[in-house]
Every structure is written in structure tokens, then in C-alpha cells.
Amino acid sequence: MEDFVRQCFNPMIVELAEKAMKEYGEDLKIETNKFAAICTHLEVCFMYSDFHFINEQGESIIVEPEDPNALLKHRFEIIEGRDRTMAWTVVNSICNTTGAEKPKFLPDLYDYKENRFIEIGVTRREVHIYYLEKANKIKSEKTHIHIFSFTGEEMATKADYTLDEESRARIKTRLFTIRQEMASRGLWDSFRQSERGEETIEERFEITGTMRRLADQSLPPNFSCLENFRAYVDGFEPNGYIEGKLSQMSKEVNARIEPFLKTTPRPIRLPDGPPCFQRSKFLLMDSLKLSIEDPNHEGEGIPLYDAIKCMRTFFGWKEPSVVKPHGKGINPNYLLSWKQVLAELQDIESEEKIPRTKNMKKTSQLKWALGENMAPEKVDFDDCKDISDLKQYDSDEPELRSFSSWIQNEFNKACELTDSIWIELDEIGEDVAPIEHIASMRRNYFTAEVSHCRATEYIMKGVYINTALLNASCAAMDDFQLIPMISKCRTKEGRRKTNLYGFIVKGRSHLRNDTDVVNFVSMEFSLTDPRLEPHKWEKYCVLEIGDMLLRSAIGQVSRPMFLYVRTNGTSKIKMKWGMEMRRCLLQSLQQIESMIEAESSVKEKDMTKEFFENRSETWPIGESPKGVEEGSIGKVCRTLLAKSVFNSLYASPQLEGFSAESRKLLLIVQALRDNLEPGTFDLGGLYEAIEECLINDPWVLLNASWFNSFLTHALR
């Protein structure tokens, strides 16, 4: 093959091909087919440019070599064949003088008449396959693509072939001659089979046989074969077409596609009104734990036993009093409910054997708090369908609430590290395949970054509470069962620790359907004074129940201990998802993994170790009014986990709607940033759809606030 190349091609082309292979560290003695391919490509580029000039009137003309008029301007600038540095210098110079957009990859030519870069392709395979590979690689509508094959086929962007037919015929004839010469020497088959694609998934992918027949049969009317359809799709100009089609569909539809520019989007309007309130099923950053280390008491692991043991660690109990009343509730009933819990725990301790579960006495205060006998009586529809004024009961629109900074503080706290370990490394067994080894390594690195995270504590707390509540709802449907809110962890030194956050009293729970509600009263310990942010605690009645001694830099200080009490409700389906909160770990691990994969594909090796161990590198975490926030890879892991956990804790229809609708606006903005010139119709309708989800949910309002920060910085 090497001898053939040296005989068949101009010595200047051979020399340029040798230099190109040397520059890329390839041996032409071994890569002989590549040597031939580079020479062929160079020759086609030169032939494309040959004899084409621009006259004084700016028209493209063809001048044969013997013509003496040498003062004409060449129509094409040849970029292919130059060393990389020189080639980029030429490209930059062209961009500066013509205003053309700088391409991501080095093109082959620049056409001064059409003012565009050209990528020339020469393929031994089907032209449309190679064309798609080129288009996928370049990803730019500004660079014109023109593909030739050794069989005389060609394909170009928008079926615009740039050159006159005679010039293209000269190139096709030369390629056919090269093929014949190779075939006569027995070199063609090896050369044809050696072609590699543009490193895409479609490499060496040919549609043949049944699939080809089905493809031709599946085309829209008016298209005889797949190539024609591909050429049509490739040359399709959407502007104006979509509007026309829409107006055909309905007389009411009148969509004008408007260009989406940097000045087009406005911030999302957040609602006005009183500040939003805390609506999670349990306290987050404000919770307080009563803990025991190295538990080894009798009945260890039985929740009620553990709870009593934790309660005994605190000695500062005092007569409870209401410090922040609930606006609408009967606050003395909340106070009496806590006193009842204390009294019944006292009674248990005096018994000879502590029971495994505790059902509370059905006192008037608990009946009120749990909504006993408060549900309207259900009547069979057949018995009342003849009543003339039968209607669904009136329900008020939810009151609009404004964004409040406490939810940002909650999120920041969820991303922080605690001094405890909340998840253990899974024992999955020995790795067998290399992919398993990589997966284990990633899981171990990720676990190390998030095992101490407060969001992980929320996961374990949520799993425990939902599991215990669902079990009790099924096992003791009629009882007001007392359920301790417990979590387990390890200290930094590895000692086991059991924590008590407070108690839940469950109401009647005849849950037939997934959405049937069980009411419960939660009573949770805290050191947070509710009077500092009363709007956050709108749904709570807060009691002061004791004084806690805390170690500080100045010695021991006494702080009041509070009990946050509220009536709440949940359903079977919500508890089922709450029990599966560990999925949040998996979701955030997968997001981190996609970042590692992106890095690995660039470097062409697995980058897991470098990704986690390069402490000097920072990564984008999110947007804030100050701009893009960056942090260590550990911080990224914890932030992604916290987002996933908050999506679970604050799950709601408002969040579903906001996520789905704001994603559309996000994709449009991303397209604008990628210079894809997006167009939109009814942008006002999209904003309406987003803003109707902003009612009163704190997590949705925070996400909307973040989105506005993103819009500000993305469109600068």
C-alpha cells in the first residue's frame, strides 16, 4: 500500500500526509491504510479549491490553470494540510476578518463566497452514515459538510453542493480511479474495511436486508427511499413551517414563534403574603436528641425500652407551660397531651415488666388532637342522589405565602457534617468483574463523603418514623399507640448510639386505600426558641418543658428545652415512600457518577480516584445571588444528597408541577447559552404554569428563588 500511495499521489500531498501522521504519533509503515486515506482526503480538498476564484464583482468564477489572470482572489482558503498551530492561526484570522463563528474542530476549507467553513469527508461506507457521524461530532449548523464516496455518491448540508457539477464530477472520477487502481493491486478490500467512523455509536453501522426494506416501507408519502428522506430532514428549515402546521390543525391556534434572546426571560414572580411555615413531618435542624452510648440495657432494640432509657438521661424536667400557642388550636389540650405521655411513661416504669408497645388512654385531649369523631359522616351516594341541592362542600383557596429565609438555613444545615456516622458500608461480597471493582470504589468514596452528613441523619430518621408508623397503623388500627421517634448511629470512635427525638401518638388508622389518612400528634424536643421565628412555627404549639445544661467555652450554661407539638397526618402511600428514603442516596450517587463518567470519557480512563482525591479542585454546587457557588467534591455530594432528601421530605403537587414546568424554561435557557437560537411560542403561558405552582410550599419557593438567581447569572 505504501508503494502504491507514493506512485499514485503528488509528492507534495505525500509529504503533507507524512507530516500529519508524524504530528499525531502514527507510523505510516504500520498504518498504511490511514496513510492512503489522509492522502485521498488532502487531494479532494485541493481539487475542491482548484480553479475557483472570486472576480472583482464578487462573483465566483472558474479559471483553468493556463489562464494568465493570476490577480484574482482564491474562493477557498485551504486549512487542511497545515500543522495544527498554523491551521488555528488561519481560522482565527478568518473569524476576526469575516465575523464568522469560531468552529470547535479544525475545518478543511473556508468559502469566501458563501462565508462559511467547510468540512470535507471522503468515505468508503454509505455517505449518509458518514454524514451523520460528522454532523454529530461537529454539532454546529455554521460549518457546511460535504461528503464524497468512492462509489460516486455525495451528500451535503441542506443538499447545497457548493461547487458546479463539473468540478464535483472531476473529484468523483478521481476517487473512482483510486478505487480501481487499488482493486487491481488487491488493496481495496483491506482499505474499505479499515475505515473507522467519527468515534460515534453508529460506527460501521449499515442498514441492510430486512431492516433496510422496512426502513424504505416506513417512510412518509412522497419519499421513495431512505436517502431522500434523510436529505429532506437534513435540509429542513423549521422557521415558519411549525406555525403553518399549527394553523392548519385549528382555527383557534395562532402560534407565532418568537426568538428567545438574553433579554426575553423575566424572573419568576414569587407570591406575596405572610411568610411560609415549616410543614415537614418531623423537625429538621431544630430537633434535639436525648442519647445513650453503647446501649446494653434489657430489651435493647425495643423502641419503648430504648425511649425510656433515653428519657432517664435527662434530669432537667419542669412543669410544662405554653410559650408559643397554636393560632387556631385548643392549646391546653396540647399541654395535657404531653403531661399524659409523661404520666403514662411513669406508669410503665413502675410495672414489673415493661411492655413492648404502649397504647395511650383515649382521653378527651388526645381525641381532640387526633380528630376523633371529627370526620363528617359518610352517606351512600344512592341514598342521597335525589337531593336537589347536593354539592361538594366549599373549600377555600390556599392562602398565598411568601418566601422566607428559614428554608435556605434548613437546606444549608442539611448539607453540613455532624459528628456521627449515619450509614454503614454495605457488605456486598467480593468484586468479580472490573466494573464491579469500579462500582465498589465509587460507592465507598461516596459513602465516606456523606456518611456524616445531616441529610443522611434525616434519611435514617425518616425511614424509622415511617416504618414504625406504618407498622402501628396496620397492627393497632383502633389504638392511640405511642411511638418513640428513634434513630441509631455511631460516634466518630465507632461506639453505637441510640437517639430519641420525641414521640408520636397515632390516631385511628383503618387505612383501606393508599390515600386514606392516619392522624398523629408529634411531640419533639428542641433547644430552638420559637419566638425568634414565630412564622416558621405557625402549625405548632410550643411548650417549655425543662432546662438543659450544655457545655460551652465559658463552662456549663443552662438553656430552656422546648417541646414542639402539632397535629399532623399521613397516608399509606406517603409512609411507603418515607420508608424508602434511602433511595435518595442512590439518586445522588448516580448524579455524581454521571459527573465522573463525563470526566473519564474526556481523559479516556476511569477518573474515580482522581475525582475524589484531588482536594484542590472545586466544582459548581449551585446558584446564589452572588453567582455560581463552588466547593469540594464532598460538598457537591452532600448538596446533591440534601436536594434529593428535601424533595422527599417536602414532596407535594406544587413541587411536581414546578419541577416539570420550570424544566422547560431551563432547557430553553440552556439552548440559548449553547447558541442554538431557540424559539418559543406562548412563553407567557409557560410562566403562568410555573407560577401557579408557587402557592405556599417553602421548598418550592426556595427552588424558585434559586431559579431566579440562575436566570440572572446565566443570561449575563
Swiss-Prot record:
Record motif Nuclear localization signal 1 (NLS1), residues: 124-139
E.C. no: 3.1.-.-
Key words of the record: Cap snatching, Endonuclease, Eukaryotic host gene expression shutoff by virus, Eukaryotic host transcription shutoff by virus, Host cytoplasm, Host gene expression shutoff by virus, Host nucleus, Host-virus interaction, Hydrolase, Inhibition of host RNA polymerase II by virus, Manganese, Metal-binding, Nuclease, Phosphoprotein
Record: residues binding Mn(2+) 1: H41, D108, E119, I120
Cofactor: how and how many bound: Binds 2 manganese ions per subunit.
PTM annotation: Phosphorylated on serines and threonines by host kinases, including human casein kinase II.
Alphabetical list of InterPro entries matching this protein: INFV_PA, PA/PA-X, PA/PA-X_sf
MF term (GO), any: metal ion binding
Signal sequence extent: none
Any single Pfam family the record assigns to this protein: Flu_PA
Function text: Plays an essential role in viral RNA transcription and replication by forming the heterotrimeric polymerase complex together with PB1 and PB2 subunits. The complex transcribes viral mRNAs by using a unique mechanism called cap-snatching. It consists in the hijacking and cleavage of host capped pre-mRNAs. These short capped RNAs are then used as primers for viral mRNAs. The PB2 subunit is responsible for the binding of the 5' cap of cellular pre-mRNAs which are subsequently cleaved after 10-13 nucleotides by the PA subunit that carries the endonuclease activity.
Subunit structure, interactors included: Influenza RNA polymerase is composed of three subunits: PB1, PB2 and PA. Interacts (via C-terminus) with PB1 (via N-terminus).
The name this protein goes by in its record: Polymerase acidic protein
Organism: Influenza A virus (strain A/China:Nanchang/11/1996 H1N1)
